A protein has these predicted regions:
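Helix-boundary and loop/linker segments of multi-pass membrane transporters
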Residues: 1-3, 45-53, 105-110
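Alpha-helical transmembrane segments of multipass membrane proteins
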Residues: 16-24, 28, 66, 70, ...
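Perimembrane loop-to-helix junctions flanking transmembrane segments
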Residues: 37-51, 96-101
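Feature marks short, highly hydrophobic, charge-poor N-terminal signal-anchor/signal peptide-like helices
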Residues: 1-12
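Outer-pore turret/helix-boundary of cation channels
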Residues: 64-93
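Pore domain of cation channels
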Residues: 10-20, 89-147
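Interfacial helix-start motif at the membrane-water boundary
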Residues: 47-67
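Membrane-interface helix-loop junction between the first two transmembrane segments
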Residues: 22-44
Length: 153
């Protein structure tokens, strides 16, 4: 049974990372239009600042949705495999695991626990990728705001 856990867990990690990479690619293209507007227009500092705040807020919300979809993939696997019976329990357990919180009060049976550990590992990877993406967006946005501030002063 342990090899089944590893096979499912690693497959789900690969799937959720593919989902994440796809989602981030779409987000990057969406954010590109914000960047072009910031670079191409002579916006005032206040308007540029509002655009960056709006873009970062939208990015945070869309990343939360993306992480929720990935948790739902794990939850569906738990239900399909019979590791958890209730879809509600499965999604609660999955969100809790993928966030590496581990305090939902739900437990997998002993022979499924490796999957829960692998989901937590997956969550660390996914949240790390998201953090790096947010950092990259800020690395691009911040210099644009600073240069705009210096032009306006």
């Amino acid at each position: 049974m342990e090899s089944v856990n590893w096979a499912w867990g690693l497959s789900l990690i690969a799937l959720t990372i593919a989902i994440h990479a796809t989602g981030l690619s779409f987000l990057a293209f969406g954010l590109r239009s914000v960047r072009f507007r910031l670079e191409g227009q002579s916006l005032g500092l206040g308007h540029a600042f509002a655009m960056v705040i709006g873009a970062m807020s939208a990015l945070g919300l869309l990343l939360a949705v993306l992480h929720g979809i990935e948790a739902a993939v794990w939850a569906a696997a738990y239900v399909w495999l019979g590791a958890l019976n209730s879809p509600q329990d499965a999604i609660l357990y999955s969100v809790d695991s993928i966030a590496t919180r581990g305090a939902s009060g739900l437990r997998l049976e002993r022979h499924w626990r490796m999957m829960g550990a692998l989901e937590a590992f997956d969550g660390m990877l996914l949240f790390g990728i998201s953090t790096a993406f947010i950092f990259a967006v800020m690395q691009i946005s911040w210099p644009m705001l600073v240069s705009r501030r210096h032009r306006n002063s």
